Amino acid sequence: MSSNFAPKGKLYLVPAPLDFGCDALSPITDVLPLATLQVAASLQHWVCENAKTTRAVLKRVGDVVPLAAPIQQHSITELPREVHKKGDHVGAQAGLQKSATLASSKPSVPAGIYDARPLLKAALDGHNMGLMSEAGLPAVADPGSSVVRAAHALGITVVPLVGPCALLLALAASGLNGQNFAFVGYLPTDAAHRSKRIRELEALAVKTGQSQLFIETPYRNAALWGALLASLQSSTLLTVASGLTLATSQVISKRVVDHKQSATLMFLDAPCVFGVGV
């Protein structure tokens, strides 16, 4: 039983390599500094997007820094699938509140937000914990914000570790406005709705100067790229960052008219970040 006066563990936000689902893997020491690897190797309690991916990353970590315990002895808990498919923020999670398992006498959680406090019991018992998504920094364009929010509510220290974040790498290399930008997630898959959304984002970028960043499932990248070229104005600046941190990484940022004229070739089967700006 944990005590209100017992030292609490910390929640470490552990970045994962960006090569999830790719044919070739980057050496983990190329993308994660030793300090991050050392912390990851010390942890035995995890909350994650995908347990299989987390175990695979831990195996790679263990090849560099010995793990504190065999992977089979680690406690690895996945976030509910609804959280990673719909997000764990206000609005996206209407209805998920009913799945919360803590009693109403605990600190309140606003309606419509997934209650992740039960996942942090190990930290309340004094154990350090890790949060990991399938690729990149958890809770940024990935699941995990509900866990971080719960940690703050419970008085658990949150420690972000250094590692890759695809959105920031893409933005930095794009030439788009890095002082005012938004990540808008996935665009609609329906062709008509997708084109409408693309034009809305373009209008917002033109009106405010705010860069608009978004992603897509790799097998839909080619369709999205075609829709962007067909829907955007010729003068709009369009960026695609493909396979970031991989040997085949490319970041190309041009006006739409120039993309059309040069027939930009990209590794669109790799994870991509797309950007629209002025």
Where do the model's predicted regions map?
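Short active-site oxyanion
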Residues: A40-W46, I156-V159, S211-Q212
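Glycine/small-residue-rich loop that forms an oxyanion/phosphate-binding "nest" at active or ligand-binding sites
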Residues: E78-A141, S145, A150-A153
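Short glycine-rich anion-binding loops that position phosphate/pyrophosphate groups of nucleotides
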Residues: L18-F20, K52, E134-P138, P218-R220, ...
